[in-house]
């Protein structure tokens, strides 16, 4: 019985080997490169050597034969992680990556894809190399590091595959297209004269728009935005104004990219579920003006600015926190997140909070390069675990005004004489104003009428009660 079982196992394995060999013959029976190759296509003869998708399998043994089973759960998880990484990679490449061509001996084209970054960002490039199984070595100086690949077969089987499915969304889209087409023609044996070679090399990155080719902004996604942020984003703090800011910059020739980011965020990112109702209503009321484009500076650079604290805290921060980061920019984000927490809780009005903000300011953005990051978790936790000063149900600006006027009145125990608080007939706070004038403008009446209804306590406009204090 055992003998026949072993024979069955042997015959099964031989069948699988023969079948696999037949598949490999079909797999490699390709002579031309496909210009419209889909991601994970088996049409490329070179993709067999690359592990673009991590596949999870395990084997089990029963009484008669070996059964090969696919671990679908882990496989799906790995596929999703890799998909998200590819989207991130494209966004990061749109900001910091390069597609370019060099001439060898003035007659041979060499194709390159890669990154040149600060030496402190080596860990990021190591992640990219490992995730792609990129057969490349680092080139390092005391200040910079490069990760570049020039193996045409590998580039076609991997980079072209990824960027065809998840396209660039800046003007680099045109550079990639010209780079890819030149590579495909080169792989298919097309010959060029010296003039054509120079023309191909010099026009890859000339920022020329191709009228018959539209950048597919509808392909924008969360991870592309994150990758682009890690390349081109900046998390700012303003100690003098006690606010945080966030921006993404780009040359004016890619202004449509910034407009597309703005449109995508406003249409797809929403306040988190536990956003206090008053704040949520105000966010939705001012939604379209929450993100602004600046005018070009003297160098032609435009910024997409996110400056409203409540919008940053209840919309931008939670979304970015939910995504997987790959670069050192995550340190900036975490420090910025801590700063946001300090401000939103009003802890910048304490000595410990103020000191921590100064420490963070010396370690964020460009200051983190060549710096010894020495802010311990205990210091941060010690501040964030303090009792909250601000009322979490109120917008940040209102809390700031309350604190400022309380300080002026030397009274830190209750809120007095601050702005206008608007309640419905059930004493539910529904909106706030920083003073009589903005309330009067909103309700289209005089500030004296606002003052009168606050003083006499009568119902305003048949449905509101106006107060100049916050009810418990």
Curated annotation (Swiss-Prot):
Q: Does the keyword Mitochondrion apply?
A: yes
What keyword terms does UniProt attach to this protein?
Answer: Mitochondrion
InterPro entries on file: Homing_endonucl, Intron_nuc_1_rpt, LAGLIDADG_dom, LAGLIDADG_Endonuclease, NUMOD1
For molecular function, the Gene Ontology terms on record are: endonuclease activity
Q: Does the keyword Nucleus apply?
A: no
Q: What is its main location?
A: mitochondrion
Its GO CC terms are: mitochondrion
Q: Where in the cell is it found?
A: Mitochondrion
What the entry lists under Pfam families is as follows: LAGLIDADG_1, NUMOD1
Please name the PANTHER family in this protein's record.
INTRON-ENCODED ENDONUCLEASE AI3-RELATED
Protein name per the record: Uncharacterized mitochondrial protein RF1
Q: Which organism is it from?
A: Saccharomyces cerevisiae (strain ATCC 204508 / S288c) (Baker's yeast)
């Amino acid at each position: 019985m055992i003998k026949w079982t072993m024979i069955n196992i042997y015959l099964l394995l031989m069948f699988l080997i023969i079948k696999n060999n037949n598949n490999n013959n079909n797999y490699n029976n390709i002579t031309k490169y496909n210009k419209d190759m889909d991601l994970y296509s088996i049409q490329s003869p070179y993709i067999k050597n690359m592990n673009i998708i991590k596949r999870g399998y395990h084997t089990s043994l029963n009484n008669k034969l070996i059964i090969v089973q696919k671990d679908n759960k882990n496989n799906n998880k790995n596929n999703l992680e890799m998909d998200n990484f590819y989207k991130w990679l494209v966004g990061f490449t749109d900001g910091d990556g390069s597609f370019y061509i060099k001439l060898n001996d003035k007659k041979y084209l060499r194709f390159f894809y890669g990154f040149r970054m600060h030496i402190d960002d080596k860990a990021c490039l190591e992640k990219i190399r490992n995730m792609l199984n990129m057969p490349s070595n680092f080139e390092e100086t005391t200040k910079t590091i490069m990760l570049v690949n020039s193996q045409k077969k590998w580039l076609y089987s991997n980079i072209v595959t990824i960027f065809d499915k998840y396209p660039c969304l800046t003007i680099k889209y045109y550079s990639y297209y010209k780079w890819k087409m030149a590579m495909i023609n080169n792989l298919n044996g097309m010959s060029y004269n010296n003039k054509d070679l120079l023309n191909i090399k010099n026009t890859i990155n000339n920022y020329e728009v191709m009228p018959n080719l539209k950048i597919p902004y509808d392909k924008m996604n969360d991870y592309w935005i994150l990758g682009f942020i890690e390349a081109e984003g900046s998390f700012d703090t303003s100690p003098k104004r006690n606010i945080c800011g966030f921006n993404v910059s780009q040359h004016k020739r890619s202004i449509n990219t910034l407009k597309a980011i703005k449109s995508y965020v406003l249409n797809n990112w929403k306040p988190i579920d536990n956003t206090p109702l008053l704040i949520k209503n105000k966010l939705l009321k001012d939604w379209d003006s929450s993100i602004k484009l600046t005018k070009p500076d003297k160098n032609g650079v435009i910024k997409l600015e996110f400056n409203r604290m409540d919008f940053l805290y209840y919309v931008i921060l939670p979304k970015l926190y939910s995504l997987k980061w790959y670069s050192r920019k995550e340190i900036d984000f975490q420090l910025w997140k801590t700063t946001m927490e300090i401000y939103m809780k009003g802890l910048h009005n304490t000595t410990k909070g103020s000191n921590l903000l100064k420490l963070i300011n010396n370690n964020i953005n460009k200051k983190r390069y060549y710096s010894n990051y020495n802010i311990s978790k205990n210091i941060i936790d010690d501040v964030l675990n303090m009792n909250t000063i601000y009322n979490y149900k109120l917008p940040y600006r209102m809390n700031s005004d309350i604190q400022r006027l309380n300080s002026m009145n030397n009274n830190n125990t209750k809120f007095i004489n601050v702005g206008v608080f608007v309640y419905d007939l059930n004493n539910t706070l529904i909106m706030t104003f920083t003073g009589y004038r903005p309330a009067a403008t909103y309700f289209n009446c005089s500030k004296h009428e606002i003052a009168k209804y606050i003083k006499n306590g009568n119902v305003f406009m048949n449905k509101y009660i106006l107060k100049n204090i916050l009810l418990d």
